[in-house]
Amino acid sequence: MGYYSLTEVTAVQYAKEHGYFEKKANVVCHEIGDGNLNYVFKLDDGEKSIIIKQALPYAKVVGESWPLSIKRATIESKALQIFAKYVPEYVPVVYSHDEELAVTVIEDLSRLTITRKGLIDGEEYPLLSQHIGRFLANVLFYTSDFGLQSEEKRVLEGTFVNPDLCKITEDLVFTDPFGHYDTNDYEPELQLTIDELWSDKTLKLKVAQYKYKFLTRKEALIHGDLHTGSIFSSPSETKVIDPEFATYGPFGFDIGQFIANLLLNALSREEEQRGVLFFHIEKTWSYFVETFTKLWIGEGVEAYTKEKQWLPIILQNIFTDTVGFAGCELIRRTIGLAHVADLDEITNKETRIQAKKQALSLGKELIKYESKNADIQLFRTLFQQTVSGGIKA
């Protein structure tokens, strides 16, 4: 029959035909997706529920003028299965994948809340940083040359060649926000700040280097889009979802994106409410380092993991990349195609514009920052300097 787009009616038919519900079951189905690239259906018969996710052959945020390969659904399904191999507690269960229809049937996580929404609403997730730090350390270590035999890594790397979505990242994260491109989206009040940003040749040279790292450093399997909208949370659980951008890339990319989105939420808050975000930023890194170090010592398969001086160099390189990638994410989420609710839902216009100017300033400083001795406190320090007016866009 070939590919066709599901509806709420045909999603129920599909689920029944594949044995997820009895033929006579009264199944309620709603399209619940708020993303840019897929349909997401929740199906519930009162006793059990599932999620059906279908990749569209175009970007929903733009329309059919932006075609995309539906093979990304297979990449997403495979990525979730790889993640589950190492950290099953931090990802939803994948029940099945239909390559022809680009349909994946997965665990319903309705008991949890999208982390971005929860943070905007003031919810606290005390285990978020512990879980994400450990998730990142396990996935990045075990899919790298340090935790995987080189021939196995090369085979796995070939599985995650993801040209369409990598091109989106190349353009929307590293290129378009730093110049005159139609995809950019921002308030007129930001124009002077943006003009200064676009004329900063030192900044552009640094962004070019980070883009080149993304293009060429195939260090480990990365999620590729690890923002707080790609994570479900509760006070006791954390689940990472939506790895359709998964590919082999730099160790620091996912860490930087996650931290940047915590910083964006911090910018939307009053000063006295920001401490929990810096707690999560600092703990994410400390749990990552702790877990990665244990795996390096106990599970390392590459010969030079036995050299004690090698690990600190690797961790410092990861941190340096984390800082720069976080800066790129701050800027693209402020003036690029895909904004974040943390800033856009600030109701007072003057406050919203000020927060966005601060996001641009902080992003610029993170990208341009150079020090081989920096530690995780750098994010707090530069943030405080930015919001206090010590750093101007």
Swiss-Prot record:
Subunit composition and interactions: Homodimer.
UniProt entry keywords in alphabetical sequence: Amino-acid biosynthesis, ATP-binding, Kinase, Methionine biosynthesis, Nucleotide-binding, Transferase
Annotated protein name in UniProt: Methylthioribose kinase
EC primary class: transferase
Similarity comment text for this entry: Belongs to the methylthioribose kinase family.
Protein's pathway: Amino-acid biosynthesis; L-methionine biosynthesis via salvage pathway; S-methyl-5-thio-alpha-D-ribose 1-phosphate from S-methyl-5'-thioadenosine (hydrolase route): step 2/2
Lineage summary: Bacteria, Bacillati, Bacillota, Bacilli, Bacillales
Function recorded in the entry: Catalyzes the phosphorylation of methylthioribose into methylthioribose-1-phosphate.
Annotated EC: 2.7.1.100
Record carries keyword Kinase: yes
Superkingdom: Bacteria
Residues the record lists as binding ATP: 38, 53, 107-109, 242-244
Any one biological process term the GO annotation gives: L-methionine salvage from methylthioadenosine
Keyword Protein biosynthesis applies: no
Catalytic reaction list: 5-(methylsulfanyl)-D-ribose + ATP = 5-(methylsulfanyl)-alpha-D-ribose 1-phosphate + ADP + H(+)
One Pfam short name: APH
GO-annotated molecular function: ATP binding; S-methyl-5-thioribose kinase activity
Classification via Gene3D superfamilies: 3.90.1200.10, Phosphorylase Kinase, domain 1
SUPFAM superfamilies assigned: Protein kinase-like (PK-like)
Signal peptide start-end: none
Binding residue positions for substrate: 225, 332
InterPro entries with a match to the protein in the record: Aminoglycoside_PTrfase, Kinase-like_dom_sf, Methylthioribose_kinase
